[in-house]
């Protein structure tokens, strides 16, 4: 086959793929219809010598024909307000949307499969802050304390998204993602040089489980989580707490008499505290004796005069009479 014949064949196949993709798009069908037996028979009847387009060729044509959309908001992107992302950067952004915006992980997986990974620049500021907003941190000053507690979740979602491509997750991928994620998180909150080594060790701990040739992280579904909780609750032992007994006073303070005090003193003696009781009694008797021995000393007659049973100070008029 000469060069011109090969060119005509390639153009014919290209036109076939384009027309078939338009037909599938307008009819709302899926690209997998090219694998149906009835379609293959119909296509072979029209032109037995023409090659049948494959599903990847149809999907690629559909992507080229459809406008490029942002992987974050899904809106059409413009060349001056959007950037093309690598798989690593796109995975990090999609991971942030899954964790911070409660995005469906399956939707993030579908986005990462696109050939054109573009994102609007207007989302970058919110994407950078979503990790801290999710932890309800007031400012970015203490952000470096929060990133280590969230790094494990990022690793799990990132691994799930990347593994959806069917690629083997190697140590090189772990190191690559680690460097990108650390630079991504270090954008907020300056770390002192004396603390950087210590905090880097905490960051390294988040990747210990990922640092292997084949990393498989199981994402538990809500049903599995509920089953795990019920399994845990079965092992719990129910403990019945008995109410604490409280005793109320039968008498108020005003109801106590001297006889009650004597009775309580006798009980104390019977219970093995005779020495303490005797000391208390001696001290009480001593106070009584001192009070009875004290006599009222009337003031000197020079300054006071006795009037109707009590002593009153002498006034100036009384001094004159005297």
UniProtKB/Swiss-Prot annotation:
Q: What is its main location?
A: nucleus
Q: Where is this region: Disordered?
A: 264-322
* Keyword line: Nucleus, Translation regulation
User: Pfam family example for this protein?
Assistant: Lin-15B
Please describe what happens when the gene is knocked out. Answer: Greatly reduced nuclear accumulation of lin-15a protein but no effect on mRNA levels.
Could you name the domain of life of the organism this protein comes from? Eukaryota
- Does the record bear Nucleus in its keywords? yes
What is one cellular component GO term in this UniProt entry? nucleus
Question: Where can this protein be found?
Answer: Nucleus
Query: What's a single GO BP term from this record?
Result: vulval development
Chain intervals with Basic and acidic residues compositional bias: 275-304
Q: In which tissues is it expressed?
A: Widely expressed throughout embryonic development. Expressed in the six multipotent ventral ectodermal blast cells, P3.p-P8.p, which generate the vulva and in their descendants throughout vulval development.
Briefly, what is this protein's role?
Required for translation, stability and/or localization of lin-15a.
Q: Which named protein is this?
A: Protein lin-56
Q: Which organism is it from?
A: Caenorhabditis elegans
